[in-house]
Amino acid sequence: ETQHQFSARESDWGFTSFMPLSELYNPSRGYLVNDTCVIEAEVAVCKVVDYWSYDSKKETGYVGLKNQGATCYMNSLLQTLYHIPYFRKAVYHMPTTENDMPSGSIPLALQSLFYKLQYNDSSVSTKELTKSFGWDMHDSFMQHDVQELNRVLSEKLEDKMKGTVVEGTIQQLFEGHHMNYIECINVDFKSTRKESFYDLQLDVKGCQDVYASFDKYVEVERLEGDNKYHAEQHGLQDAKKGVLFIDFPPVLQLQLKRFEYDFMRDTMVKINDRYEFPLQLDLDRDDGKYLSPDADRNVRNLYTLHSVLVHSGGVHGGHYYAFIRPTLSDQWFKFDDERVTKEDAKRALEEQYGGEEELPQTNPGLNNTPFKFTKYSNAYMLVYIRESDKDKIICNVDEKDIAEHLRIRLEKDREEKERRKKEKAEAHLYTIIKVARDDDLTAQIGKDIYFDLVDHDKVPSFRIQKQMPFTQFK
């Protein structure tokens, strides 16, 4: 079996190494039947993407983020946050001044990054943002924990938003609450504790899908035997222990536990098991079995999938990218560092479930069983948006939401970058000459000295086109 992808650059092709004649004539291989060999050819028309000339903005309307060395995990998270418009609008409305430096201010660095993602025509650097984190070059070449980065960034923004018009935005978007309870079986005693969360960690191992993980999350544990619960004045009692949800946030972030410690092998391992996640997630299912008695049953907890963050590789390294539906339409986009491409739903969902995949054996002379291989690319984080809140969250963000000083500063930076780019592109058309005029000769040599050399460091320079006629320059 062989294949070739024809393109404008490679429009002619011959399959010179299709199969050795000796193998074709070998009776045990089964290619010749009644002195006849059947050759099957398949032709498909596909859209060829030239990596070097590919323009993400032109093809998709979006631009990517540059990788500083090992910051692809951060890039996928930043793209996900940027494409939550309500969050982006709140970041733009954080108070910053023209005297702030992006490298020393997380809010300004994030505003600058988001502005460039929104208005640039090419990929955007994250160096200002990582400098505002206090990172050096070494940090940029180390992969950090995505969940930890998400929490630290949220905490810092939450703190910076206090006392401003956008105070409480992080909580409004991402904060939910659950109730931890212990209830005695034989006596009337119950202990409860309310806790908040900004994301939920769901088990992958032993769970078929997201619903199975939620079932496990609220699973009731029995406290009995040597593990009885001490119920204050009631002493040791048999009890039930569990968790139920009081409310879910408008933007639900689910961290899938793809990495865990293996006690048998005394090392961290990656769980590549097949794990399914739905396009729509109904957390009111089965009469609200995930909800506590205090939950508001008037709130409809039906969610639609917004982002799928993917890890490709093993426990000690790999690559991160994200599939995102910025407007929750049917069109998915893959954000892979600098490159943004359009993708279909199957690519974003089913192909990120993980597990094993079969490759059928196509050799007609052998009766082989299908070959299975483990898929090391799979989802590790999911972002869902509640249906009843999507019109508020997927809102319009335009220039009026951006501080004037930020627009002016970044527009100047953009113009200066374009000037340097144009100058570099046209550099081969120009040359620098120095011209010693009569005034220079008089000033440097004097009236009575005629043969000493002129100091050309002190005469004016001119940048001229190489093709410019002398008469025009004169």
Walk through the language-model features, giving the residues of each.
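Protein/peptide-recognition domains central to ubiquitin and immune signaling
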Residues: 1-55
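Short, recurring structural edge motifs at helix starts
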Residues: 26, 169-172, 457-463, 474
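Exposed substrate/partner-binding surface patches
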Residues: 31-60, 81-83, 91-104, 108, ...
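Short, contiguous acidic and Ser/Thr-rich linear segments
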Residues: 64-70, 449-472
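Active-site nucleophilic cysteine motif
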Residues: 67-80, 141-152, 317-319, 382, ...
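Carboxylate-rich, divalent-cation-coordinating active-site regions
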Residues: 72, 184, 254
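Conserved, non-catalytic sequence blocks in retroelement Pol enzymes and Pol-derived host proteins
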Residues: 100-101, 138-145, 173-175
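Cys/His-enriched microdomains
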Residues: 180-182, 229
